[in-house]
Amino acid sequence: MRSSALLLSTPVASASRRIVLFFSSGEREKKNHTCTSRTKLSIILIFVLAPIFSFSQDSLKTEFHKIGDSADYITNFSYHQTLTPQQKKKRIWLVAGGNVVAYGATMIGLYSAWYKNYPQTGFHSFNDWPEWKQVDKVGHFYSAYIESRASMELWRWTGIDRKKRIWIGGMSGAFYQTVIEVLDGFSAGWGWSWADFGANILGSGALVAQEFAWNDQRIKLKFSFHNKTYSDPALNQRSDVLFGETASERFIKDYNGQTYWASANLKSFFPKSNLPPWLSLSVGYGAEGLFGGTQNIAKDVNGNITFNRPDIKRYRQWYLAPDIDLSKIKTNSKGLKFFLTFLSAFKFPAPALEFSNGKFKAHAIYF
């Protein structure tokens, strides 16, 4: 797998022992994390462009539909315009053609810039499930969800049937990432990862299931990051090798600083309450002490140990924190609406309760 968060992929162990002959441990790690960065950046790009494309054409309105004789209400987003068949057809061709051209160009560029520079082999798979405390797998889950969310909004703009929009747009994230998984399967330096594939399907499935159940994303997947520095120079040096030296590289690659969240909008679940529509409660997952895929050790091409820190504990972290659903903030500004929608992919900084190593820890502000 290549890690994953944002087409996120994680650093991977090599698919066969002979790969060690081609790359030193540090080189493989850099290569795999480069893959991570290209995936994340591509997801961010898709998420940015999709709302721009749709919001630039139409404004959203909120329609309230009463359920039976009760006071329960559900919120459904639709467009002011009633599209003619010709308008729908034009938009469908525009979105479909844009997807094919943009994604095709991305894949060609990705192959030319990356895969063709490394040895190719027959299609093969490998098991990278034990690596990185599965933070990379959660990253795949998040990436597929965000891609699907962006794609679904594009298809919503076309005015196509609701079910078609949900299925076509909703499963786009899994499709986009699966193509890259296939390319990995033919690359000697990686391999097809069933764990990655499963996480991709589940991420897109989470969006599809919510749309069919609630016609809304009551539980949004989000991402946060805090930069990690250490008092031990050896750990900083190791982090430079694995995750890059700049803050932007660390943001994309450092699993020790990444947290993934499931943020539930409370008003959506309790419509009769007086809760503000933007208030959410989120559960987060992360890990620390990760200076290698499965253990904190690294070797060079000759098998010499270059980093060996079994004393550093590798552990999982769970979080509980309030959150703000920025997409629920009302505004008549298309630009601000887009900006808030984009930011809704990221966790809002807030107090948090952490559970790790069998203990609770409070954070005044966590991101």
Predicted features along the sequence, with ranges:
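Cleavable N-terminal export/targeting peptides
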Residues: M1-G26, H33-H80, Y366-F367
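N-terminal targeting leaders of membrane proteins
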Residues: S54-K137, F141-S148, M152-I160, N274, ...
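Small-polar-interrupted transmembrane alpha-helices in polytopic inner-membrane proteins
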Residues: A102-T106, R165-G185, I201-S204
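Alpha-helical transmembrane segments that form the membrane-embedded catalytic/substrate-binding core
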Residues: H140-E147, D184-E211, Y319
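Residues on the lipid-exposed face of transmembrane beta-strands in outer-membrane beta-barrel proteins
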Residues: G205-A209, Y260-L266, L320-L326, A362-H363
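Residues that define the transmembrane beta-barrel architecture of outer-membrane proteins
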Residues: D254-Y260, P277, K313-L320
